[in-house]
């Protein structure tokens, strides 16, 4: 009778075991066994309910997490335990057997505390809930009545039960509630989150909870939308709003730990400010501390935005992710102050500083800008920032410009930019000076004279830049990136006059970085030139293209280096360079800056150091410039820097275990002789504990009455379990804690095993912390050598760019440009030049052109000593006419692009090219309005033209395309003529002037430059040739005109049966095209024939009317000239007018 009497006790325990936390302490188990009393008599219903349960939950098969085949093998004999261990071990992550012993096992019951985080009061509440639960299930109809509960209460309760294990279960909902009464309270962990969230309301928080990262409230809804993950409903607001009074949990969403970098990057790329809240104490150390019953301590450890996100997995904008050109990755700080009155013609003083955290580049500038904000636009288009930090208030014009350029995901930067604003006090200048001084003075205390020089350099910055620098230091301190400003070697002024000025309008008109169709890189000048092998080389090439050189010596050095690489193609020394660059898979520039910030991973550090070591070994024998095999100073100086980094790189690699670093194994990362004392101490501690555990097997065997030491087994990740057959349970001491079991065996931990496991866990967690600290110290040591390493990478990027330009130079038809001395008058000559982009895109190639502007001095050396223009008489400017779609704009773009190519040091697609250096390229092309500024098409035209007239110098190249098209014919013609005359006579720069106002030829003929013997023609009239074919019912031989000037059209006797077809020859010829043939373009655009017939008739009538007026005017002038009258000067003027009218006729 003794056996059946124990059954009710076991049945009752089976119910309570599901709701009472399992205690593994042997002392508690001992006290519980000692205080056992006979169970009270149970009712029949209770017995019937309990009789349907298994006799003991610890022996239920469902508690064993090992696969069924493993269980089956274990039950067959002692060898089954070994099979079970193999099955479990196969599920673990691969790591070396040598270091696996140091990794903390995350699935033991001793870490349940990390997943539960309940205080004593919550435990008592759970016990009360258990008592009520057993009471309600004490009759057969309990489940039926449970299902009849209010559906809303059941749904809310269901949401709570599906929460994580680290949160307490809410009390059951009652059907009768007072309106507006709270249904429960937040968990301690949620209260902890709420406290952090209220301090960072503008930040989307990702919270570490156990072995997941979770989002709460509105953050969860945002994460669910952006990351396509599930959001469990609950509270979305962070205040006690009555509308959510019936909810007792925050809405939540979760992601796995290993996916944090991926999801954080996606949220940052979407424009959010993301914060990561981590647990800063571990389970084993917490258990040994005083706050074992309190929630884990959590703090905001990382904050990321679009401009500050740096991680080990690469850039935010991966190649091919967007259709537009990616942004430059810069964080730009901007402030402005009014220069004069804030009126319609407002001017502002602007200060900017742009930081690229991923590479360490810093750009600053201070300038005055007019009401059109052209200067700001130019810098924004060059820098392409992904994030703005605005200090103080901006004027409406500046604010609208920033919104226009960055406010959508399809803007010219390629993606939506994030904007953050900070206030600007009246004493901001003094505060900024003090802040920057304190920042750099702190660096100077513990360093050498270099820090003092660094401080002096920074304090010389303009006031507006100083304000931006102070704001940026404060801003980046929040993200842990303020150390970037230690590297003042990489401070660059945007407006240094060592480079050609290319404003934003020119960048867009010439399609330098992206095409004008879909804003992608294909079809741009960068696309045509980019033959680089590395990412850092590609970034440098982009800078070269955007900032052509004005220093002729540097330019000659760069061209000579490209020429030498071209002449030595397929030689061993050039192939060695190419193969070395091709072998570089890592982005060394970004890897170095991540090392500097301490954000580099172990595999990335190994890859970076090994790559640098391989590069330095390639040129280890280079001791002098002669050893490089090249004569170019640019090539030799770049190669000479590579072997200099070999000692420091080799010294760091000698400390690292390459195999462990490749597997990201922190415990074996350092070779044993280079391990710190803390690492060695904790490894010895773990070994000692494991030795004690091994010796304890004999003691456990004695307790069980066995002579042979027991064997430990590992089941479901729980180590050091002692298996005892259920037939021998009588021998098990009462102090042993049962962990799990099956039908045939039970598994226990002895008090000694529990104590030793806890001690080992403390050693393991301390070891992990010591390994991380040692790795951080190594990164700090390498960061101290950042500048020589960065110089080596800069040399590699220079070599990559030069090789890219030499690859382009090897294309058919490319030639080396010739630069005339600075003392030479402005001059440009191109023989058989081609468009550098269009020739790659057009299936039939590009028809070359020959042109000259300016005057070639007799003393200048040139491969083309007598360059000729189409007319044989080069002038300062060209007036270009021709039919629509005849190639006028393409020709002017090609000329500007060839000048830009020559001044970045590239060969050019032409037979020959001679030029003086241009300090700027200005363009005014196309017709567009500017709605966000309230500017019409013509307003945009004249505003851009006015900016050009103010900034152009005699050394500039100006391209004006169809100026005056946005207004009436008379006004447009008058403005175009006045601008043409002003540029030629007053500015005196090289200019290409495209127009459909044929009568401007008369203005052009009267413009001259120079005095006396130096006097020469100011404007040359040229046109794009075409062939005109008139088809009639009976075709005659005179219906074809090939000269292209249109003068054969007037006397052809056009009638309604006549059709005219135009064939574009795309060739430059002297003279003026007196017709634009717009109807031909309309025919190509498939305008309805009836519309074309009416348009042709109207065009003919207008031409006849204008012709009649000109004849009448000419007759009047003839009479005035023949019969005299008036002053002698009037006679000469009338004669000139008569000549002009006759030419037009």
Curated annotation (Swiss-Prot):
Q: Where in the cell is it found?
A: Nucleus
Which stretches are tagged as biased composition: Basic and acidic residues? Answer: 121-131
Q: Which Pfam families does UniProt cross-reference here?
A: MutS_I, MutS_II, MutS_III, MutS_IV, MutS_V
Mispair-binding domain: where is this region? 183-307
Q: Where is the composition biased (Polar residues)?
A: 13-33
Q: Where is this region: Disordered?
A: 1-183, 857-879, 1030-1056
Instruction: Cite the binding residues for ATP.
Output: 882-889
One Gene Ontology cellular component term attached to this UniProt record is: nucleus
The UniProt record lists the keyword Protease: no
Keyword list (alphabetical) reads: ATP-binding, DNA damage, DNA repair, DNA-binding, Nucleotide-binding, Nucleus
Q: Name one GO biological process term.
A: mitotic recombination
- Which stretches does UniProt call biased (Acidic residues)? 158-169, 1036-1048
Could you cite one Gene Ontology molecular function of this protein?
ATP binding
Subunit relationships:
Heterodimer consisting of msh-2-msh-3 (MutS beta). Forms a ternary complex with MutL alpha (mlh-1-pms-1).
Q: What does this protein do?
A: Component of the post-replicative DNA mismatch repair system (MMR). Heterodimerizes with msh-2 to form MutS beta, which binds to DNA mismatches thereby initiating DNA repair. Msh-3 provides substrate-binding and substrate specificity to the complex. When bound, the MutS beta heterodimer bends the DNA helix and shields approximately 20 base pairs. Acts mainly to repair insertion-deletion loops (IDLs) from 2 to 13 nucleotides in size, but can also repair base-base and single insertion-deletion mismatches that occur during replication.
> What does the similarity note say?
Belongs to the DNA mismatch repair MutS family. MSH3 subfamily.
What name does this protein carry? DNA mismatch repair protein msh-3
Q: Which organism is it from?
A: Neurospora crassa (strain ATCC 24698 / 74-OR23-1A / CBS 708.71 / DSM 1257 / FGSC 987)
Q: Which gene encodes it?
A: msh-3
């Amino acid at each position: 009778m003794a056996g059946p009497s124990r059954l009710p006790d076991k049945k009752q325990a089976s119910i309570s075991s599901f709701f009472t936390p399992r205690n593994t302490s042997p002392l508690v188990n001992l006290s519980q066994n000692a205080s056992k009393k006979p169970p009270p008599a149970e009712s029949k219903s209770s017995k019937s309910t309990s009789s349907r349960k298994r006799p003991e939950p610890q022996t239920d098969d469902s508690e064993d997490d090992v696969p069924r085949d493993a269980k089956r093998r274990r039950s067959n004999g002692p060898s089954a335990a070994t099979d079970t261990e193999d099955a479990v071990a196969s599920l673990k992550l691969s790591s070396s057997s040598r270091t696996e012993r140091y990794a903390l096992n995350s699935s033991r019951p001793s870490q349940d505390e990390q997943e539960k985080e309940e205080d004593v009061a919550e435990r008592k509440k759970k016990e009360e809930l258990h008592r009520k639960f057993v009471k309600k299930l004490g009759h057969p109809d309990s489940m039926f009545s449970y299902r009849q509960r209010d559906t809303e209460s059941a749904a809310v309760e269901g949401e709570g039960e599906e929460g994580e294990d680290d949160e307490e279960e809410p009390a059951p909902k009652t059907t009768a509630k007072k309106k507006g009464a709270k249904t429960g309270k937040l968990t301690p962990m949620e209260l902890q989150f709420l406290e952090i969230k209220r301090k960072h309301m503008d930040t989307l928080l990702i919270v570490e909870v156990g072995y997941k990262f979770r989002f709460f409230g509105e953050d969860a809804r945002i994460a669910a939308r952006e990351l396509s993950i599930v959001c469990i409903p609950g509270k979305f607001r962070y205040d006690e709003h009555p509308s959510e009074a019936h909810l007792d949990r925050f809405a939540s969403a979760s992601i796995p730990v290993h996916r944090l970098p991926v999801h954080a990057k996606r949220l940052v790329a979407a424009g959010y400010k993301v914060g990561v809240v981590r647990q800063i104490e571990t389970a084993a150390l917490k258990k040994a501390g005083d706050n074992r019953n309190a929630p884990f301590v959590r703090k905001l450890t990382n904050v990321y935005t679009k401009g500050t996100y740096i991680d080990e997995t690469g850039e935010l904008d991966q190649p091919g992710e967007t259709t537009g050109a990616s942004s430059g990755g810069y964080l730009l700080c901007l402030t402005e102050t009014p220069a004069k009155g804030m009126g319609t013609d407002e001017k502002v003083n602007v200060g900017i500083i742009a930081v690229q955290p991923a590479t360490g580049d810093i750009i600053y500038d201070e300038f005055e800008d007019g009401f059109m904000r052209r200067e700001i636009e130019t810098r924004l288009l060059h820098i392409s920032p992904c994030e703005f930090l605005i200090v103080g208030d901006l004027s409406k014009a500046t604010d609208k410009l920033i919104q226009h350029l960055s406010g959508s995901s399809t803007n010219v930067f390629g993606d939506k930019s994030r904007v953050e604003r900070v206030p600007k006090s009246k004493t901001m200048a003094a505060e900024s000076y003090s802040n920057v001084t304190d920042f750099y003075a702190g660096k100077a205390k513990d360093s050498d004279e270099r820090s003092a020089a660094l401080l002096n350099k920074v304090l010389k910055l303009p006031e507006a830049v100083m304000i931006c620098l102070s704001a940026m230091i404060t801003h980046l301190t929040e993200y842990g990136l303020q150390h970037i400003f230690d590297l003042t070697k990489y401070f660059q002024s945007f407006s240094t006059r060592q480079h050609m000025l290319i404003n934003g309008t020119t960048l867009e008109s010439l399609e330098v970085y992206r095409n004008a169709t879909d804003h992608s890189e294909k079809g741009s000048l960068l696309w045509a030139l980019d033959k680089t092998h590395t990412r850092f080389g590609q970034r440098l090439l982009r800078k070269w293209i955007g900032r052509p050189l004005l220093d002729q010596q540097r330019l000659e050095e760069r061209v000579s280096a490209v020429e030498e690489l071209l002449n030595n193609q397929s030689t061993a020394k050039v192939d060695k360079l190419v193969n070395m660059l091709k072998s570089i898979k890592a982005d060394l520039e970004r890897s170095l800056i991540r090392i500097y910030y301490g954000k580099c991973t172990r595999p990335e550090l190994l890859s970076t150091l090994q790559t640098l070591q391989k590069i330095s070994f390639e040129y280890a024998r280079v001791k002098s410039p002669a050893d490089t095999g090249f004569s170019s100073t640019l090539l030799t100086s770049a190669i000479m820097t590579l072997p200099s980094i070999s000692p420091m790189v080799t010294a760091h690699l000698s400390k690292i275990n390459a195999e462990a670093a490749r597997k990201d194994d922190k415990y074996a990362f350092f070779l044993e002789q280079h391990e710190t004392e803390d690492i060695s101490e904790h490894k010895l501690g773990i070994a000692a504990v494991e030795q004690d555990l091994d010796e304890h097997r004999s003691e456990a065997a004695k307790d069980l009455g066995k002579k042979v030491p027991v064997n430990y087994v590992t089941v479901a990740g729980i180590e050091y379990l002692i298996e005892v057959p259920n037939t021998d349970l009588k021998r098990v001491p009462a102090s042993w804690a049962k962990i799990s079991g099956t039908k045939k065996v039970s598994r226990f931990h002895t008090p000694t095993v529990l104590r030793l496991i806890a001690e080992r866990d403390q050693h393991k967690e301390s070891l992990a912390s010591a390994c991380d600290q040692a790795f951080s110290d190594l990164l700090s040591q390498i960061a101290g050598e950042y500048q020589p390493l960065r110089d080596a990478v800069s040399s590699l990027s220079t070599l990559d760019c030069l090789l890219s330009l030499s690859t382009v130079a090897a294309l058919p038809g490319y030639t080396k440009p010739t630069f005339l001395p600075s003392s030479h008058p402005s001059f440009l000559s191109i023989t058989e030049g081609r468009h550098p982009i269009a020739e790659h895109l057009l299936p039939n190639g590009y028809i070359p052109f020959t042109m000259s502007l300016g005057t070639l001095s007799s003393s200048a050396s040139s491969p083309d000593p007598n360059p000729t223009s189409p007319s044989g008489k080069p002038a300062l400017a060209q007036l270009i006419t021709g039919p629509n779609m005849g190639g006028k704009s393409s020709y002017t773009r090609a000329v500007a692009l060839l000048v830009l190519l020559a001044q970045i040091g590239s060969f050019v697609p032409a037979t020959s090219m001679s030029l003086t250096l241009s300090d700027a390229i200005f363009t005014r092309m196309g017709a567009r309005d500017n709605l966000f500024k309230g500017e019409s098409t013509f307003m945009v035209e004249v505003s851009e033209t006015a900016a050009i007239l103010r900034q152009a110098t005699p050394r500039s190249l100006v391209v004006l395309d169809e100026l005056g098209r946005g207004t009436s014919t008379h006004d447009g013609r008058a403005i175009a003529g006045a601008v043409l005359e002003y540029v030629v006579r007053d500015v005196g720069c090289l200019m290409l002037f495209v127009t459909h106002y044929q009568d401007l030829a008369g203005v052009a003929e009267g413009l001259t430059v120079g005095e006396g013997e130096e006097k020469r023609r100011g404007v040359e009239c040229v046109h794009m040739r075409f062939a005109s074919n008139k088809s009639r019912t009976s075709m005659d031989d005179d219906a074809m005109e090939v000269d292209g000037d249109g003068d054969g059209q007037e006397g052809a006797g056009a009638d309604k049966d006549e059709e005219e077809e135009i064939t574009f020859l795309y060739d430059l010829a002297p003279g003026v095209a007196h017709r634009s043939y717009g109807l031909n373009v309309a025919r190509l655009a498939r305008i309805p024939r009836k519309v074309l017939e009416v348009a042709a008739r109207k065009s003919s009538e207008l031409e006849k009317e204008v012709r009649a007026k000109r004849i009448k005017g000419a007759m009047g002038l003839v009479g005035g000239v023949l019969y005299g009258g008036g002053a002698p000067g009037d006679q000469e003027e009338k004669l000139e007018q008569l000549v002009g009218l006759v030419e037009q006729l």
